[in-house]
Swiss-Prot record:
This is Uncharacterized oxidoreductase C1739.08c. The active site is at S157, Y172, K176. It comes from Schizosaccharomyces pombe (strain 972 / ATCC 24843) (Fission yeast). It is found in: Cytoplasm; Nucleus. NADP(+) binds at I33, K60, D78, N105, Y172, K176, T206. GO terms for molecular function: oxidoreductase activity, acting on the CH-OH group of donors, NAD or NADP as acceptor. Pfam families: adh_short_C2. GO terms for cellular component: cytosol; nucleus. Its EC number is 1.-.-.-. SUPFAM superfamilies: NAD(P)-binding Rossmann-fold domains (SSF51735). Its main location: cytoplasm. The keyword Metal-binding does not apply. It comes from the Eukaryota.
Length: 261
């Protein structure tokens, strides 16, 4: 049976958002949304491991550690393969004896119609966007169960809920819908020892390929602009902290109202 945090009934509400003394891992955090998440966790007092594949964030991590006074480590992990994720998790355990919060954020954009995308391209999208979350959940879930506690947050997308138009991105929609549903299933399966939630961003200004492509949707967002990645920090911090201690199986859509239309 899940138990509430020891101080949940007595703590000041702002203290519930603290990650002081907690160890966090953010997969796919070299830049963009991932680095904003890592920054939020560090600013809230959590120690952080930032994983990456191509862009080395070591210098940014050092600066973040100096600014916040917490541990900020970097680790290169290829999330597209099970053996490298398993090896990466073993390295993570050498750094942190306990792991409190894990964010599966790595992913790839994909903008091609089904008839223009051979099956191997669909398989690649699913491998990076969906299978990687399963890999992280599989290896981290074993640790959570052994510890008796854990918190997994996955980055899905509003495309898990709606069908984007007029662009044709069926493969991407399918991959993110699978992430969303996987998290809901895990929330039930792991209720005794872990909380599992997902975040579904809408159109955000990032340095991922396709940013200029996204700008054409600004007029259709009720806020009339794209989101900024720092605007996601509070959402992930809420789910990572004791402020959401009775929240599991939730998909939080952060889209400036786009899916309301």
């Amino acid at each position: 049976m899940s138990t509430p945090p020891a101080n949940v009934t007595t703590a000041h509400v702002l203290d519930l958002f603290s990650l002081k003394g907690k160890n966090c891992v953010v997969f796919g955090a070299a830049k963009g949304i991932g680095f904003s998440i890592a920054t939020a966790f560090a600013q809230a007092g959590g120690n952080v491991i930032i994983t990456y594949l191509t862009t080395d964030p070591t210098e940014k991590a050092k600066k973040l550690a100096e600014e916040t006074g917490v541990q900020v480590h970097t680790l290169k992990i290829d999330i597209s393969r099970s053996d490298t994720v398993e090896a990466g998790v073993e390295e993570i355990q050498k750094i942190f004896k306990e792991i409190h919060v894990v964010v599966a954020n790595a992913g790839m954009p994909f903008r091609r119609s089904v008839l223009d995308s051979p099956p191997h391209e669909f398989e690649k999208v699913m491998n990076i966007n969906t299978n990687s979350v399963y890999r992280v959940a599989y290896y981290m879930g074993k640790i959570f169960k052994k510890q008796g506690f854990g918190n997994l947050i996955a980055t899905a997308s509003m495309s898990a809920t709606i069908v984007n138009a007029p662009q044709h991105i069926a493969a991407y929609c399918a991959s993110k819908a699978a992430v969303r549903q996987l998290c809901k299933a895990l929330a039930v399966e792991w209720a005794e020892f872990a909380r599992i939630n997902s975040v579904s961003p809408g159109y955000f200004a990032t340095d991922m390929p396709g940013y200029e492509f996204l700008k054409q949707w600004e007029p259709y967002v009720p806020f009339k602009r794209l989101g900024l990645t720092p605007e996601l920090r509070g959402t992930y911090l809420y789910l990572a902290s004791n402020a959401s201690s009775f929240v599991t199986g939730l998909d939080l859509i952060v889209d400036g109202g786009y899916t309301c239309l």
